[in-house]
Amino acid sequence: MIPEKQSTLLHKAEASLLQRALDGDTQAANTVFNYLSSTNQNLRQIMEDTLHELQDDRLWRHLLRCLALQRWDDQLDCERRRDPEASARIDAAICEAFVEDVSEEDRELKITVLREGMAHSDARLRYAAAYLLGLRKDLRAVPILDEAIDSADHQWQLRAIQALAIMKHEHCGRPLIKALAKDRGTVHQAANRALHELDTAAQSAYVEALNHPNRHIRWHAARGLGHIGDARCVDILVEGLYDDNQSIRWATARVLANLDRSAVPAILNVLIEHTLTEPLREASFHALNSMPSAQTHEQLRPLLLVLRGSSTSTQASAIAQRLLADWHS
């Protein structure tokens, strides 16, 4: 542990370094970021503590610019940006400094800078400011994060998704559905995880997405509703039982099973209306056989026996029709 007096001297030295950087000394700025990019956590913490102690709005504006553009004034903020791991540590340190408050004055200073940043003419600064406000769970960031999902590059799309997930508010659901529809790559995957983290806060966005023009997005919305026990998903969710993708078929079956009796009529309709291919037979059997209710199992016993074997489409359809007719009687 650093003795108290020595620690104070170190902070005075770092404060002087920061002041020189703010006055235009690029070598001092480079040294500041050498601290923030260090693998030594103690060095990073000393500099982060000093950022808070200085209480200078110019510093927070510079740091916002560094996160958005990797620039200190008009030059690269740090030579170590050329090392991806060091650059990631710099960004993480900046984010941590913006999110953690040591006083009310510290908090107000940063929020003022970030709100100004969201109105900047440079989209990259807007996205960075909204991202940091989102990490602080400030819902005023949502419209700019939504814009980032529409227009930003891949990195800032992922950061926007991260911030929306952290806020865990129903207003975050619609932008995440938009991100889900972007592609089938990392943005899609990140949005899917974020929606899952929102849990019930995503419900209204899921319901709206049941009418999405993209069938795959409708299925994701239905699956999300199924996970939170909302039976409005069932009629769309069952489409996943005959999807070409095996992972979608099995994920569909698991969610339908958790919905138990409320999912049965829709599954029966699928078996009545569609040819019983082997993939559909397996997925339907898995959904029905995995339902937790003993009463449901007993009612479905004739159909489960047929689906367990190599039944014909006609056999399964006939039994499904009888069960459906009797289901609510």
Question: Model regions: which residues?
Answer:
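Structural detector for internal amphipathic alpha-helices that build alpha-solenoid repeat scaffolds
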Residues: 2-23, 30-37, 42-54, 61-69, ...
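Active-site glycine/GP-rich loop and adjacent strand/helix microenvironment
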Residues: 297
